[in-house]
């Protein structure tokens, strides 16, 4: 009895010591994972576990997203997971997504896994039409997506229809034109073929470099009202805060870069923005829900922090990551070059093999022809020899007949003819015998000449037979494989060798020399756009090519706005924001209040 009680106590003790857990499902852009989490875990514990599992070190761009009553929310790092307003049914589901976007993907995204996750997310946003993308740019982006998935274009492998099951273009773009899937595939493939030699990470980065210049890239939109009650849209992104007309999400009416904002706070549904210049009055707006204000503040804090970080020297961790990325890139470049060399050598060997097979077949044909010529020569020689023998026998026979005729003539001459009639008759016979003898002599001479000619022809035929045998012998003894020229080894590649105080809902931004740094960033953007001149020409060419197939009645409001901007010689997103910030902050605040 005592033993049973002790056993139950021991089991209860073990049960109490065993940590209680709950199941979490994490959904990324291309996978799902499940984890057992302890009840006491905070958001940071779960977030760090996911990042370690993915091998992700650039954690500052990402977050765990969930939905509360149709409103997006993000897991807070310092709050217990189960203290969030999430479903208590297991598994608790979160989406691992990019929360903040870089200003320049090529400069800021270091790890390949980071680039890949951004690529998948931005691609989905474009296909789901959460980011507006013009038709011609959609085709170009699709070609890079195909390069990332399939590698280099190979006509023997990527035959017509190989993209039939792929989702590559927004449905809006497909419905806008009278074009068959085959016509779209043809245009995508034409660009896809030009991307030869780009690895998956390079193709994905080219995709992001184009996508980041789209007007709606990286912008979170929120419905707000100003003091006058005018319905507007607030856009929060990596560059600052932007105010939009609800009917036009492409071009902001006003912009406030992060370097002009000193403090952001909210009370209930009212949001307050304090400009850096204290002489300028604050401006306020109202959102629809308190929960939305919390989200806006989170995005403002995170984007401002990254805005500041970009304009400072890289931390030691980032420097190490960039160094490792450079080494990895150099290693992959060497590997690609090695594979390219091997592929080149293999193709060269295959070409040499094909050439040898072709030459061998040619030599076999030549040998067959030589054999046939030899056989014909032998047959001709046999026929000539036989004909010469017959002619020689005929000549002998004629000579014998001529001798007999001569003897007959002599016999007749020796015979005495007594009567005149017999004499005349004999003279006639003698004359006939002489004519016959003359003809026999001429025929004999002709036959003799013909025999000589046949002997000469026989000699020539035997000479031709000898030459044919000699050529056949040369073909038989000729080397089958010609010497191969060594492939020169390529030269070795160059190897490059806001803080939140307590629980207050306010955030102060520190002053810094932001304008100068912003100008430097803008300068880099301008240089990038200059390099993209050829790309823009290609886009314009495709736009012109498919314009005749457009169904105008199917254009959306954003299509019309984009076309109007283009017709006015619309500039890039960054240039548009720069123009909007040329006015003083005071005048922009006043303009916002009067909207």
Swiss-Prot record:
Probable regulator of the Hippo/SWH (Sav/Wts/Hpo) signaling pathway, a signaling pathway that plays a pivotal role in tumor suppression by restricting proliferation and promoting apoptosis. Along with WWC1 can synergistically induce the phosphorylation of LATS1 and LATS2 and can probably function in the regulation of the Hippo/SWH (Sav/Wts/Hpo) signaling pathway. May act as a membrane stabilizing protein. May inhibit PI3 kinase by binding to AGAP2 and impairing its stimulating activity. PANTHER family: MERLIN/MOESIN/EZRIN/RADIXIN. It is a peripheral membrane protein. One of its GO terms (cellular component) is lamellipodium. Phosphorylation of Ser-518 inhibits nuclear localization by disrupting the intramolecular association of the FERM domain with the C-terminal tail. Ubiquitinated by the CUL4A-RBX1-DDB1-DCAF1/VprBP E3 ubiquitin-protein ligase complex for ubiquitination and subsequent proteasome-dependent degradation. Residues 22-311 form the FERM domain. It comes from the Eukaryota. The gene is NF2. The modification Phosphoserine is found at residues 13, 518. Disulfide bonds: none annotated. One of its GO terms (molecular function) is actin binding. It comes from Papio anubis (Olive baboon). This is Merlin. Interacts with NHERF1, HGS and AGAP2. Interacts with SGSM3. Interacts (via FERM domain) with MPP1. Interacts with LAYN and WWC1. Interacts with the CUL4A-RBX1-DDB1-VprBP/DCAF1 E3 ubiquitin-protein ligase complex. The unphosphorylated form interacts (via FERM domain) with VPRBP/DCAF1. Interacts (via FERM domain) with NOP53; the interaction is direct. Interacts with SCHIP1; the interaction is direct. One of its GO terms (biological process) is negative regulation of MAPK cascade. It is found in: Cell membrane; Cell projection; Cytoplasm, Cytoskeleton; Nucleus. Pfam families: ERM_C, ERM_helical, FERM_C, FERM_M, FERM_N. Its main location: membrane. Keywords: Cell membrane, Cell projection, Cytoplasm, Cytoskeleton, Membrane, Nucleus, Phosphoprotein, Tumor suppressor, Ubl conjugation.
């Amino acid at each position: 009895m005592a033993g049973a009680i002790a056993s139950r106590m021991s089991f209860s003790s073990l049960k109490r010591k065993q940590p209680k857990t709950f199941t979490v499902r994490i959904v990324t852009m291309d996978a799902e994972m499940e984890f057992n989490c302890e009840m006491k875990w905070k958001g940071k514990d779960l977030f760090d576990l996911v990042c370690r599992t993915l091998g992700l070190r650039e954690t500052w761009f990402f977050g765990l997203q969930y939905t509360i009553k149709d409103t997006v929310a993000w897991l807070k790092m310092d709050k217990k997971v189960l203290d969030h307003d999430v479903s208590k049914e297991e598994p608790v589901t979160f989406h691992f997504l990019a929360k903040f976007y870089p200003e320049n993907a090529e400069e800021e995204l270091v790890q390949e896994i980071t680039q890949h996750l951004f690529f998948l997310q931005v691609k989905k946003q474009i296909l789901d039409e959460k980011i507006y993308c013009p038709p011609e740019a959609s085709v170009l982006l699709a070609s890079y997506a195909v390069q990332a998935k399939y590698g280099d274009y190979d006509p023997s492998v990527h035959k017509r229809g190989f993209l039939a099951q792929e989702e590559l273009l927004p449905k809006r773009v497909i419905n806008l034109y009278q074009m068959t899937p085959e016509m779209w595939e043809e245009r995508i493939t034409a660009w896809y073929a030009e991307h030869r030699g780009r690895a998956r990470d390079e193709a994905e980065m080219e995709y992001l470099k184009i996508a980041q210049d789209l007007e709606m890239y990286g912008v979170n939109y929120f419905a707000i009202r100003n003091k006058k009650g005018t319905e507007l849209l607030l856009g929060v992104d990596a560059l600052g805060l932007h105010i939009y007309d609800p009917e036009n999400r492409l071009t902001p009416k006003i912009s406030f870069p992060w370097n002009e904002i000193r403090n952001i706070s909210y009370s209930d549904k009212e949001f307050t923005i304090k400009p850096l210049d204290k002489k300028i009055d604050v401006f306020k707006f109202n959102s629809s829900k308190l929960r939305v204000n919390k989200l806006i503040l989170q995005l403002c804090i995170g984007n401002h922090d990254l805005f500041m970080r970009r304009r400072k020297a890289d931390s030691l961790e980032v420097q190490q990551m960039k160094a490792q990325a450079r080494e990895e890139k150099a290693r992959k470049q060497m590997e690609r070059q090695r594979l390219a060399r091997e592929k080149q050598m293999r193709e060269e060997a295959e070409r040499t093999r094909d050439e040898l097979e072709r030459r061998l077949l040619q030599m076999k044909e030549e040998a067959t022809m030589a054999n046939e010529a030899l056989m014909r020569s032998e047959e001709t020689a046999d026929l000539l020899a036989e004909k010469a023998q017959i002619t020689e026998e005929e000549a002998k026979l004629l000579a014998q007949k001529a001798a007999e005729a001569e003897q007959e003539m002599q016999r007749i001459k020796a015979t005495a003819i007594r009567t005149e009639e017999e004499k005349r008759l004999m003279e006639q016979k003698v004359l006939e015998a002489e004519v016959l003898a003359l003809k026999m002599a001429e025929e004999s001479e002709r036959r003799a000449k013909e025999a000589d000619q046949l002997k000469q022809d026989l000699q020539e035929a035997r000479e031709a037979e000898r030459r044919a045998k000699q050529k056949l012998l040369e073909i038989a003894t000729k080397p089958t494989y010609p010497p191969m020229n060594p492939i020169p080894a390529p030269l070795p590649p160059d190897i490059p060798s806001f803080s939140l105080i307590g629980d207050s809902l306010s955030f102060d931004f520190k002053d810094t020399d932001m304008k100068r740094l912003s100008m430097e960033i803008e300068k880099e953007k301008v240089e990038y756009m200059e390099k993209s001149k050829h790309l823009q020409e290609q886009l314009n060419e495709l736009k012109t090519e498919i314009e005749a197939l457009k169904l105008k009645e199917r254009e959306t409001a954003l299509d019309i706005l984009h076309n109007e901007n283009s017709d006015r010689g619309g500039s890039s997103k960054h240039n548009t924001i720069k123009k909007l910030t040329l006015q003083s902050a005071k005048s922009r605040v006043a303009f916002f209040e009067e909207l």
